[in-house]
């Protein structure tokens, strides 16, 4: 199984288009300690020829250009992407579907709740129904979006997408709204969880024994955005568990047997984005890698 992290940042990327927080300012200045990053997306293949796209980032065209394995290969129209899978309905995970509208057949897989959020906005009807089949997937139901690639979706604590919030949203519920994906091929397992509000015992049990985990790295501490002076929301309010602190993902998963541990979906205010910073060194010392655009895994 092969996997490529197409986009490693949270919504808005790094640097964000209008942001001059300390980290974005470094990126705008070309400081090599802060790599530019596009928004969250992953490509997975059982053989390097046929690919599953997990989440369609607003930056998908840029990501495809940067990834030769995903370039058209023959004929007038072609893509090695056979299917797209959504783990939630967030803008940074669905907006890229609009870029994939150019008369190209593929299958779109998601839970009923996530598909309904897409169907609720008629702009996504540009994906012609006769070309893009929408396939509903049940939780804990194993299916093959690409032949040879077995996928099981499972609930993780989360919340509804920001654009669907009404009043005060329920945060941390385990429903079809936010899911993780267990992807298996050739006896190897990769877990992709780009959004998670907290680490539960059920999640710890499910992740035990995976060969690689790509996990929500949105915030280092719950108050990252507040400290940076660019927002008032905590990680919890956004539906994202912090890396550090009591209940943080590093501590919560420390005793779980996991092969490679990689943080993805990293917000522009997260100090781990600065190479060789105290935060980066601490995360790496705990056994985690900080994912970057173009990072490739072979399992």
From Swiss-Prot:
It comes from the Bacteria. Keywords: PQQ biosynthesis, Transport. One of its GO terms (biological process) is pyrroloquinoline quinone biosynthetic process. The keyword Mitochondrion does not apply. CDD domains: PQQB-like_MBL-fold. Pathway: Cofactor biosynthesis; pyrroloquinoline quinone biosynthesis. InterPro entries: Metallo-B-lactamas, PQQ_synth_PqqB, RibonucZ/Hydroxyglut_hydro. Pfam families: Lactamase_B_2. Belongs to the PqqB family. PANTHER family: COENZYME PQQ SYNTHESIS PROTEIN B, HYDROLASE C777.06C-RELATED-RELATED. May be involved in the transport of PQQ or its precursor to the periplasm. This is Coenzyme PQQ synthesis protein B. The lineage of its organism: Bacteria, Pseudomonadati, Pseudomonadota, Alphaproteobacteria, Hyphomicrobiales.
